[in-house]
């Protein structure tokens, strides 16, 4: 069977939601709209996303609706019960998560902390939700003096362990995180990821290094990535994609340091010869701007991404398909620091399209995975609807 597209390049703009989901009230997220609220008052345009049809999905500041969009577009709602990165990505590739991962707004249970201390022989300090930079400013000097483990969490279902690289060598920190991953597989904890967060520097001038490592749970079933890999296709994971799926279904993993580095890595991969998918997560939208409620920074990051699209498109082959989407919302104007339950935008573009139009929106994140699976003639996910026949 001939494939309409030899390669699919899937880009997740982490947290760039496009309006409250139908069940937003269940998550106390009524009125959330990451894109609209981020772009309100922004004094620059997004000409490339506009041409593709982003402004046709929903009314947005600085992004107009266009009469002849160059891409197909829609918005999708989440069927799974969480609004975290892992849940969103797993659903994109065909899994629905009906038991949510747990978040720990008051820190982790004393029982778990004691287990970590006994297992590692090191005391645990902090044990609260915090930003990574804030927590090392607060506890970094103490950690250097004592060798204690700085354990903290966020609005996500994660347990993070920070340590100075000169005090706890990377290999030891990674080993500790692997052991904590095993501990927290106990269903009573339901923690999505354990994250090693090494840092360097002196008191008052600490910086986190790029030696971060995530220890995820393995997806509880086969995803579209597994079916692609089993079918002999390339699955190139860029950024934190490899960690999100714990390496399952991935044939090559490329690390990134930032959104722009992620785009640089994607450009290199687009110029390579392969058949299958590249799958890029651009985490800065979420980690640097959404959680920190930095609206101007968030808007500028979207502009920086928009600026890179002509370079990407000029390097595409005729039978390439680019899908731009998100995994949840993180409205920088919402109260608190948590993700927001939102629709995700979906834009599908190929050089061979003569133009595009709206696609059905009454379906779920898994429609992205279904479209990719359908293209490569591998097992379709149980959920979602393939748009492949409409992409002409």
Curated annotation (Swiss-Prot):
It catalyses: 2-deoxy-alpha-D-ribose 1-phosphate = 2-deoxy-D-ribose 5-phosphate; alpha-D-ribose 1-phosphate = D-ribose 5-phosphate. Transmembrane segments: none annotated. Mn(2+) 2 binds at residues 286, 291, 339. Coiled coil: none annotated. GO terms for cellular component: cytosol. It comes from the Bacteria. This is Phosphopentomutase. The gene is deoB.
């Amino acid at each position: 069977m001939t494939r309409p597209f030899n390669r699919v390049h899937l880009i997740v703009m982490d947290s760039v939601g496009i309006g409250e989901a139908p069940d937003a009230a269940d998550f106390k997220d009524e009125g959330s709209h990451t894109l609209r609220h981020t772009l309100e008052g922004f004094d620059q345009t997004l000409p490339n996303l506009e041409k593709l049809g982003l402004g046709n999905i929903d009314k947005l500041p600085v992004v107009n609706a266009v009469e002849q969009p160059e891409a197909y577009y829609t918005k999708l709602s989440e069927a799974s019960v969480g609004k975290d990165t892992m849940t969103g990505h797993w659903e994109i590739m065909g899994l629905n998560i009906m038991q949510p991962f747990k978040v720990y707004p008051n820190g982790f249970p004393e029982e778990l902390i004691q287990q970590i201390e006994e297992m590692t022989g090191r005391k645990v300090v902090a044990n609260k939700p915090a930003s990574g930079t804030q927590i090392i400013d607060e506890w970094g000097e103490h950690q250097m003096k004592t060798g204690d483990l700085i354990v903290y969490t966020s609005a996500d279902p994660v347990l993070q362990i920070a340590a100075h690289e000169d005090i706890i060598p990377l290999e030891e920190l990674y080993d500790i995180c692997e052991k904590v991953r095993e501990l927290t597989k106990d269903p009573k904890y339901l923690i999505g990821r354990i994250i090693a967060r090494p840092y360097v520097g002196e008191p008052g001038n600490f910086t986190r290094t790029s030696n971060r490592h995530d220890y995820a749970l393995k997806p509880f079933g086969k995803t579209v990535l597994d079916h692609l890999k089993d079918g002999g296709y390339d699955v190139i994971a860029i950024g934190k994609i490899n960690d999100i799926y714990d390496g399952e279904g991935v044939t090559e993993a490329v690390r990134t340091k930032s959104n722009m580095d992620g785009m640089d890595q994607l450009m290199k991969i687009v110029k390579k010869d392969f058949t299958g998918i590249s799958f890029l997560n651009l985490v800065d939208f979420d980690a640097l701007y959404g959680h920190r409620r930095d609206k101007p920074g968030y808007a500028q990051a979207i502009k920086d991404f928009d600026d890179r699209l002509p370079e990407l498109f000029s390097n595409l082959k005729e039978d390439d398909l680019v899908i731009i989407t998100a995994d949840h919302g993180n409205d920088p104007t919402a109260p608190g620091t948590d993700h927001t339950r939102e629709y995700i935008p979906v834009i599908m573009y190929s050089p061979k399209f003569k133009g595009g139009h709206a696609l059905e929106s009454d379906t779920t994140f898994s429609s992205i995975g279904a479209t990719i699976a359908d293209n490569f003639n591998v097992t379709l996910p149980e959920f979602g609807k393939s748009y492949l026949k409409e992409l002409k």
